[in-house]
A protein has these predicted regions:
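Selective transmembrane helix interface/packing segments
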Residues: 1-358
Length: 358
């Protein structure tokens, strides 16, 4: 499988031959940052279009069809329209926190997005405590949401923000336990190493029952973490209008909207990385010809295919199940998912100690 570190090393050598090393490193950081933001924007556009089409399919509709072939240009038109909208600042609001909140949410999303290993040698932030960094970066978004609700001077926004904060903080525990289950299996917290350990089989299939249970818990908790249906109580239209979004307009609302969709992709990308092998191709023992053919498919194609499969799965869940009440959401987490996650972690420890995994 192709290693993108060959390209990055060549670019680094080329830049250092033309300029001082410090300036070359600075230029590399700028290039990587621009590429990260471009990929972030492209993923957001693809996710929004996919959401509208999947929603339409489940509701026996066609979705966007007018602008461009099969409605592919509709999202770009919506972005242009949003860019022209006036950003209205609410009277008696805390203007500093009100304007700062969307950018905190975006910052948390971008930092978490940078942790995803897209292909071998194509990781932006890859170090030995990558799991810790991902959990820490993703938790910053809760601060932005609470600030948005508090600074809007609106009781519905505040209630929506408090619901969202309680929900996100609670379900981070189950996400952490699910990821920790795989960390115990691999003995590493570096995402690239977790992927490399799956060269002979994805953990969803070779980690036995604890890995499967962790995957199911992760999908449920991840859906709740990004406030997607049936866990989208912070935006319950019949109760709170738009929740903490209520008083936001223009690009401020757009930043919240984009962050929600990219966070969904991040949850799916992490699931693809730790459970489905990341950039590793599908290999079947004994099928040498098939395995060789699969190796020719680039790693980033495998990663995005797996990630978007999980995205589709989560969208299917959203448009299938009815919205839960806040007490049902917290009961599901504290009475069921957390205890099951703890017992499952203990089972994985037993599996690893007695070498019961493949």
């Amino acid at each position: 499988m192709f290693d993108f570190s060959i390209i990055t090393s060549w670019v680094h050598g080329l830049l250092t031959s033309w300029m001082p090393e410090g300036l070359a490193i600075f230029l590399e950081c700028v290039i990587v940052g621009v590429c990260l933001l471009l990929m972030y924007a492209v993923i957001a556009i693809v996710m929004i279009f996919m959401e509208r089409k999947v929603c339409a399919a489940f509701q026996c509709r066609l979705g966007p069809m007018r602008v461009g072939p099969w409605g592919t240009v509709q999202v770009f038109c919506d972005v242009l329209k949003m860019l022209t909208k006036e950003i209205i600042t609410i009277r008696h609001s805390d203007r500093l926190l009100y304007n700062l909140a969307p950018y905190i949410v975006i910052l948390a999303s971008v930092l978490a997005f940078a942790c995803l290993p897209v292909a071998r040698g194509l990781e932006i932030l890859d170090f030995n405590v990558g799991v810790f960094f991902l959990m820490a970066a993703s938790s910053i978004g809760v601060v932005g949401i609470l600030l948005a609700g508090w600074s809007s001077n609106n009781k519905y926004s505040l209630i929506g923000a408090m619901r969202s904060g309680a929900q996100m903080i609670s379900y981070e525990l189950s996400i952490g336990l699910s990821i920790l289950t795989i960390v115990v299996l691999t003995d590493t917290m570096q995402f690239s190493e977790i992927v490399e350990r799956q060269a002979d089989g994805w953990f969803l299939f070779k980690g036995h029952i604890p890995a499967l249970i962790a995957f199911v818990i992760y999908l449920i908790a991840g859906n709740a973490e990004v406030n997607r249906g049936p866990f989208d109580l912070p935006e319950a239209e019949s109760e709170l209008t738009a929740g903490y979004h209520t008083e936001y307009s223009g690009m401020h609302f757009g930043l919240f909207y984009v962050a929600e969709f990219v966070n969904l992709f991040i949850i799916s990308g992490v699931a693809a990385t730790i459970f489905l092998g990341g950039w590793m191709p599908l290999h079947i023992p004994g099928w040498e010809g098939f395995n060789t053919a699969m190796d020719y498919i680039p790693g980033f194609v495998w990663f995005f295919a797996k990630a978007f499969f999980v995205v589709w799965l989560l969208m299917w869940i959203k448009w299938t199940f009815p919205r839960l009440r806040i007490d049902q959401i917290l009961t599901l987490e504290w009475k069921y998912l957390v205890p099951i996650g703890l017992v499952n972690l203990l089972l994985m420890v037993i599996v690893v100690v007695f070498k019961l995994h493949f």
